[in-house]
């Protein structure tokens, strides 16, 4: 499976951002996020899970990029999530085309955090 670029493209636009804290060690959090979002062999999505940078990136379609960062601290880790438009042309249409993903993103992030807490805390 092709890797997603580690660096966010210069023309990219952040559409939504979320964060939450989990009282668990960073490595199991990272591993769980990486496992959940790995599209598997043969997927058309680009995917990178970089444990040295604590980042998981899934990029697919012409506009969509999801970034997950695990930021360790003394009491666990903060999970940061960004939905990013990487559309190279028609950049304004990315928000419109992705409106369903953007509308459901808060609830999806909350489900992820609830699940991670149940699994790891």
Go through the PLM ranges and name each one:
Residues 58-119:
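Beta-strand/loop substructures that line and gate deep hydrophobic ligand-binding cavities in soluble
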Residues 47-57:
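Short, hydrophobic/aromatic-rich segments at coil-to-beta transitions
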Residues 1-45:
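Hydrophobic ligand-binding cavity/cleft-lining segments
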Residues 28, 32, 115-120:
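Generic non-transmembrane alpha-helical segments
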Residues 22-27, 47-49, 69-78:
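A short, structured loop/turn motif at beta-sheet edges
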Residues 19-21, 55-57, 78:
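Ser/Thr- (and often Asn-) enriched beta-sheet segments in non-cytosolic proteins
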Residues 14, 50, 62-64:
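Residues that act as N-cap/strand-start positions at coil-to-secondary-structure junctions
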């Amino acid at each position: 499976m092709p890797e997603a670029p580690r660096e966010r493209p210069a023309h990219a636009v952040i559409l939504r951002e979320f964060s939450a804290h989990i009282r668990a060690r960073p490595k199991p959090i990272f591993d769980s996020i990486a496992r959940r979002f790995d599209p598997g062999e043969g997927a058309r999505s680009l995917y990178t899970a970089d444990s040295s940078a604590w980042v998981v990136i899934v990029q697919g379609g012409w506009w969509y990029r999801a970034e997950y960062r695990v930021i360790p601290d003394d009491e666990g880790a903060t999970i940061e999530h960004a939905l990013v438009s990487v559309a190279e042309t028609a950049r304004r249409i990315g928000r419109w085309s992705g409106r369903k993903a953007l509308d459901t993103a808060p609830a999806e992030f909350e489900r992820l955090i609830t699940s991670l807490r149940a699994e790891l805390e």
